[in-house]
Amino acid sequence: MIVRSLPAALRACARLQPHDPAFTFMDYEQDWDGVAITLTWSQLYRRTLNVARELSRCGSTGDRVVISAPQGLEYVVAFLGALQAGRIAVPLSVPQGGVTDERSDSVLSDSSPVAILTTSSAVDDVVQHVARRPGESPPSIIEVDLLDLDAPNGYTFKEDEYPSTAYLQYTSGSTRTPAGVVMSHQNVRVNFEQLMSGYFADTDGIPPPNSALVSWLPFYHDMGLVIGICAPILGGYPAVLTSPVSFLQRPARWMHLMASDFHAFSAAPNFAFELAARRTTDDDMAGRDLGNILTILSGSERVQAATIKRFADRFARFNLQERVIRPSYGLAEATVYVATSKPGQPPETVDFDTESLSAGHAKPCAGGGATSLISYMLPRSPIVRIVDSDTCIECPDGTVGEIWVHGDNVANGYWQKPDESERTFGGKIVTPSPGTPEGPWLRTGDSGFVTDGKMFIIGRIKDLLIVYGRNHSPDDIEATIQEITRGRCAAISVPGDRSTEKLVAIIELKKRGDSDQDAMARLGAIKREVTSALSSSHGLSVADLVLVAPGSIPITTSGKVRRGACVEQYRQDQFARLDA
C-alpha cells in the first residue's frame, strides 16, 4: 500500500478492511484484569473526520494543534484528526496539575497552537496550565470525548492541500528547552519502510499474516508514536495498546498482551526488560505461551546485553525465543529508526579492550578488562557513516567517531531554530568516499564505530566522562553498577582538586533492613561491592557514591537520566542520602 500521507493510509484501510479491528486499548483502570475497547478501521476513520471538522473552525492549514490527553483511543483519534484537518500535530503529555511543568510550557510557547485536543478527564489540568500563560492568544480547548464522534460526516480535505509537515516531535528534553523535530509525511512513510526492511530482512520486509503491534509506550514519545499509531496505519495492521502506568503497575500485563494467538511486534526501552524479568512471577505467566512473538525491539536508551540475557532466560520456559529480541538504534531526528541487530539469531555481543576503546580504538579482546557492546547491522537505508566530528572526515574501520545519518527519514530541522538545525542537520563530509554523499548529514551526537561490517554504539558524546584524562562511557559504568543494584543510577564527573575531574555515582536503592543498623550495614556492603566492581572492570576509583531513594534521579519524559541536572543537584548538595 503506497500512500503519500497518514490520512491517506487511514482512508485506504477504512476502504479495504472497514470492519476489521484497528486499535484495541486495554483499560486496566476500569478492571485490574483489563477491559478491551476496540475501534474498527471505519469507526476510526469516521471519528478522525469528526475531529477534523471541529478543527476546521480553528486556524488554517499548517497551524499547530497540541494533543494533550491521557493514553487511550481518544489520543489516537485526536492525533489523526489533527492530521486529517491539515494541521500540524504536536503530541504532548497531560500537564502536571498544580505544579510548574517546564516541558509543557516550552512546547506551548514554541509551537503556538491554535487548539489543544484533550479529554474531559484532563481538561481541568490543561485549562489551568494554559491560564498561567498571560499575554498570549489562548488556543481553543476541545474535549474530544464530548464530540459526537460517530456522527455521519461528509468532511473532505484534498490530499494535495495537506502541509508537508505531519507533526512536531519534541525531543525528550535532557535540557529544559526541548526542540521540535519537524517530521514530514515522507519522513514517516520512508522510516516505516526502512524499519520493516530491517526487522524483516529475511522476508523482504513483509511480516507474516496475523501480525499485530503491541505497545504501552507513551504516544508523545517518538517510539511510542511511530510503533503505537503510525506503523499500524501505514501497514494496515491491528494494534493492541495500553498505558505506561498500566505497565509500571504490573509489568506482566505487557507479557500477557504479547502471549496471544497473533504474531506480536512490540518495543520497549532497556529498563522495561529488566522490570518485566524481575517483577513477573511464574503465577503471572501460568498458561501463557510467548512462542508467537515476532519481534520485541529494545531501543530508546542504551541496550544492555546482560538485561537482554536475563529477560530471555526468565521467559524461556514460556517459549520465548531469544532471537526475537532485537536491539535497535534510532533517534527522533531520524523519525525513530536507524539500525537493528541481525535477524534470525540471538543478539550478538563483542568484547573490546576498555583501555583501547577509551583512546578511540576498537580492539576486540577476550578475558578481563573488556567492554561488551552489542552489534548492529550496518543499514543500507538510511546511510550511516562514522565521522571525525572535528575534521568532518570519515573514520577508518575500528576508529571511534560520531555517528552520522543520511536518508529521507531524516527531518529537515527543528521548528523555528535555524542555527541549531544547521548545526545538527547540515553536516558535510570532507572528501567523501565513493558512494558516500557529501551531505546533508544528521550529526547524531552519538559515538560509535564500524568494524567487520558491523556497527557498535558507545553513547552520547556530550555525556562522555573524562576522568584523569581518560574517556569513559557513563552507560558502561552504569551497567556495571546496575548488575549489583538492579535500579536506576547515574554516573557523572564533577570538578575535583588540581583541575581534574572525579567520578561520582548516584544510585537509587530501597532502604531495607529489620533495623536502621541492618539497613546501614546493607548500604555499606553495596558501596563496597560497587567500588570494587568499578575498580576491577573500569580501572576507576569512585570519589563519591550517593545512595538515594527510588525516584530521586531526574529523568526525561522518556525515562532517560538527565545527567546535567544530576551534576547541578550534586554540586548544590540537593540529594537526600540514605546513609546520611
From Swiss-Prot:
**SUPFAM superfamilies to which the protein is assigned, alphabetical:** Acetyl-CoA synthetase-like (SSF56801)
InterPro entries tied to this protein: AMP-bd_C, AMP-bd_C_sf, AMP-dep_synth/lig_dom, ANL_N_sf, FAAL/FAAC, LCFA-AMP_ligase_FadD28
Quote the Pfam families the UniProt record gives. AMP-binding, AMP-dom_DIP2-like
Membrane-spanning ranges: none
Question: What is one cellular component GO term in this UniProt entry?
Answer: plasma membrane
GO BP annotations, alphabetical order: Actinobacterium-type cell wall biogenesis; fatty acid biosynthetic process
Query: Which segments carry the region annotation Disordered?
Result: 421-440
Q: What is its EC number?
A: 6.2.1.49
Q: Which reaction does it catalyse?
A: holo-[mycocerosate synthase] + a long-chain fatty acid + ATP = a long-chain fatty acyl-[mycocerosate synthase] + AMP + diphosphate; a long-chain fatty acid + ATP + H(+) = a long-chain fatty acyl-AMP + diphosphate; holo-[mycocerosate synthase] + a long-chain fatty acyl-AMP = a long-chain fatty acyl-[mycocerosate synthase] + AMP + H(+)
Knockout phenotype, as recorded, reads: Disruption mutant lacks the ability to produce mycosides and mycocerosyl phthiocerol esters.
**Sorted UniProt keywords:** ATP-binding, Fatty acid metabolism, Ligase, Lipid metabolism, Nucleotide-binding
The kind of enzyme this is, by top-level EC class, is ligase
Extract one GO molecular function annotation from the record: ATP binding
Q: State which pathway it belongs to.
A: Lipid metabolism; fatty acid biosynthesis
Q: Which family does it belong to?
A: Belongs to the ATP-dependent AMP-binding enzyme family.
Q: Which NCBIfam families did the record assign? A: FAAL_FadD28, PRK05850.1
Q: What does this protein do?
A: Involved in the biosynthesis of phthiocerol dimycocerosate (PDIM), a cell wall-associated lipid found only in pathogenic mycobacteria. Catalyzes the activation of long-chain fatty acids as acyl-adenylates (acyl-AMP), which are then transferred to the multifunctional polyketide synthase Mas for further chain extension.
Q: What's this protein's name?
A: Long-chain-fatty-acid--AMP ligase FadD28
Task: State the organism named in the record.
Answer: Mycobacterium bovis (strain ATCC BAA-935 / AF2122/97)
